[in-house]
Amino acid sequence: MKQKKTKPTYRLRNWKEYNAALERRGSLTLWLSDEVVQAWRNTARTGERGHPQTYSDLAILTICTLQAVYHLPLRGTRGLVLSIFELLRLKLPVPSFSQLSRRRQTLEVRLPRQRRGAALHVVVDSTGVKVFGEGEWKVRQHGYTRRRTWRKLHLGVDEATGEIVAAVVTTNNYSDGQVLPDLLDQVDEAVRQVSGDGAYDKRNCYDAIRAREATATIPPQHNAKIWQHGNTKAERLVRDQNLRRIRQVGRGAWKKEVGYHRRSLAETTMFREKMIFGEQVSARSFNGQATQLLVRCAALNRMTHLGMPDSYKA
């Protein structure tokens, strides 16, 4: 009788530090710092006609971040900021719901990074995020009665740190392979390796990776054929070399050789994003939904910088 495999148990080496990092995530002073308060009002001048914006982009970004971290509706987040300013006796205005909704459409979100200076191993993947629709329990019990809509969040993750280095939001009719070049364009550092699943087994993906002088660790699809004849004088294709090696040693052995299992870090990051911030967005427009998801990615990076678990198999 075949015995059922038991999951290994893991323990933390840095439990005290990681516990403090988890507590720090909920600190208001982390998300609403003195620097944010000082830069709350917009002082930049565009030189164009019309009244300049009252609030800085940092102020709008901070409110959107508080909404994501504390799982509040936008109006409730505005109420939170009003109460904080009242408690601190700060005579600062707070943007209205209409202002927040409008400014969120065009807000530029930059991912906070801790650059290491070394060439990166980027692992890529995507996940679906529900925009609107019925709850899973209702669907299971009674079936669908209306259409459900999804957005796709595409991520590039630093294999060494778990930090998000690139993020793109699309509608659900974009394939993973179409978005990979855009993800790599967001990475300023040198890239030594790019890992992804079979959805990235496309010519444009290999071209984008080769343009960065990186190694592609992408398993060819099970019915894959050689793209370029072995006797040609042209440069050997990494994809064809991977396919030949898989035929020699098997797919499982090839994955071990190239460290393909590290690709699961992208899935772990997706899981963290959904567990911390939820599996759906509340904004009505696509631009607002994209901003919500990118704000979550930026907040997740800041949480990563506070401290990550250092685990070992017990």
Show which residues each predicted segment covers.
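Basic, amphipathic alpha-helical segments enriched in Lys/Arg and hydrophobic/aromatic residues
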Residues: 56-57, 61-69, 251-314
